Regions:
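Extended helical scaffolds that flank P-loop GTPase cores
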Residues: 155-157, 179-230
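Helical mechanochemical/support elements of P-loop NTPase systems and associated helical scaffolds
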Residues: 53, 70, 82, 86-89, ...
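Canonical P-loop GTPase G-domain recognition
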Residues: 136-190
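Conserved nucleotide-binding/hydrolysis micro-motifs of P-loop NTPases
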Residues: 54, 76-77, 108-112, 135-139, ...
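Conserved G1/Walker A P-loop phosphate-binding module
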Residues: 2-82, 97, 101
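Conserved P-loop NTPase architecture
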Residues: 1-16, 119, 136, 155, ...
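Conserved C-terminal guanine-recognition region of P-loop GTPase G domains, centered on the G4
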Residues: 65-66, 89-159
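Residue-level signature of catalytic and energy-coupling elements of molecular machines
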Residues: 38-39, 57, 73, 90, ...
Length: 230
């Protein structure tokens, strides 16, 4: 099943997303987390949804119904290491376009798999909101998610959401507004031993998101974080 320009706005194959003076909000996430459902709910467009990996190959953009923003639905991917076309498209957009904020959609029924991508994006920009989608499915499975505790650990807003029913979407928009106006200052970034980062630097295989500049924390460990994003 393909995507059409009439159903999803403008695709990357036509020169990227449509140029606009509006703030740009990127929607990122693994395949099958309901990211396109979030996009549809916020824009009123009809991006095709499905339960197969790699469905969204190109960028799809649309104007938010309730806020003066341009939303960009990035291809579903599991990391920002460009091992696939989807990962390369998502990585390049976040790195080069520098959206005003990023909403990272996670699967409430499988947080551990979704969090890896979220942590990579937090290393690029602090203007991140974590949208834990499919919370209704998680409740059916008896899964409880402590959003407040997760927010404290990550240092960025965390919103519980069910895009199909509309639960949490207003809270998601409010959280995005907050991070654009006041970017979080104490976001969680993975810290690596100095020996690891020195080896990666010398081998030329620094993972995306890691700074080439040596930064140490109070314990003398190397900090990994992309420092160029303002």
């Amino acid at each position: 099943m393909g995507l059409t320009n009439s159903s999803v706005g403008r695709s990357a194959s036509q020169g990227g997303f449509e140029a606009t003076n509006l703030p740009v909000i990127a929607l990122a996430g693994n395949p099958n987390v309901g990211k396109s459902t979030v996009f549809n709910a916020l824009t009123g467009l009809k991006q095709h949804t499905g339960n197969w990996a790699g469905k969204t190959i190109e960028l799809c953009s649309g104007k938010c119904k309730k806020e003066p923003w341009q939303l960009v639905d990035l291809p579903g991917c599991y990391s920002l290491s460009p091992r696939s076309r989807e990962e390369a498209v998502a990585r390049d957009f976040l790195k080069e376009r520098k959206p005003n904020a990023a909403a990272v959609v996670l699967d409430a029924t499988c947080l551990e798999r979704s969090l890896a991508l979220a942590l990579q994006i937090i290393e690029i920009t602090e203007k991140v909101v974590i949208c834990i989608n499919l919370i209704d499915e998680a409740r059916k499975c008896g899964i409880h998610i402590d959003a407040e505790r997760l927010e404290m650990r990550l240092g960025v807003p965390v919103v519980l959401c069910s895009a199909r029913s509309g639960e949490g979407l207003c809270e998601l928009l409010e959280a995005v507004k907050r991070v654009m106006a006041n970017p979080p200052e104490n976001v969680y970034r993975i810290q690596y031993p100095k020996s690891v980062t020195e080896y990666l630097q010398n081998s030329g295989r620094m993972p995306f998101g890691c700074s080439n500049k040596s930064d140490k924390n109070e314990d003398g460990e190397q900090e990994c974080g992309f420092k160029e994003h303002s």
